[in-house]
Amino acid sequence: MAKGIRERLLEQAIKFHQWQEAAYPGKTSEELGGEWEVDYPYWNDTYSAFCHVLTQTDAETADSVLLDEMVYLIARDNEAEGFIQETTSHPQWFERLCRRAAASNESEAKWQFAAYLPECPCRQEVKDMILDFAKDPNEYVSRRALLAMPALYFLADMVKLLERLCHVPADKILCILRRAKFTK
């Protein structure tokens, strides 16, 4: 990976961390909640550096530091969703970052990956990660995954998946889906 491209994005991530600490001393992202990230004045520079990594580097060469910071930035951009939208156009990056997000504590990144899985032309094994997101302890992550399932699976497949996931008989699942207007 070109060192300058990686370093530019990492510098932007550090800048964001520094801004967060200065603006909200001692508060974690989870403690802040809400839409606090929208006040960050350098989103355009950060977005540009992020896109440069996606377009100019190979996802397989990314190290854990870069992947963690990219997941962090996707999570912080949860109001605009620009980072995740751009990532869907780069399937190799989407796959690596989706796996990294699933293993992280970044619920704001997890729900975005769950929601955008249907839009990414990634491999089926990655699309099947929707089940991991559906079982996530964070209710919003789980709900967004369940909402994305119909776009990923045919109804019969979805019923089987929900049967396994929820331990509920198929007839009850179909009843719930009918009420939710997923099927007639």
Residue ranges of model-derived segments:
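Amphipathic alpha-helical scaffolding segments comprising HEAT/armadillo-like alpha-solenoid repeats
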Residues: 57-68, 90-103, 122-135, 154-166
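Accessory, usually C-terminal, subdomains that scaffold auxiliary metal cofactors
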Residues: 165-173
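Structural detector for internal amphipathic alpha-helices that build alpha-solenoid repeat scaffolds
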Residues: 33-56, 68-89, 108-122, 140-155, ...
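Surface-exposed polar/charged interaction patches
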Residues: 19-22, 56, 60, 73, ...
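Extended amphipathic alpha-helical repeat scaffolds
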Residues: 1-47
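Residue-level signal for secondary-structure boundary elements
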Residues: 21-28, 62, 82, 173
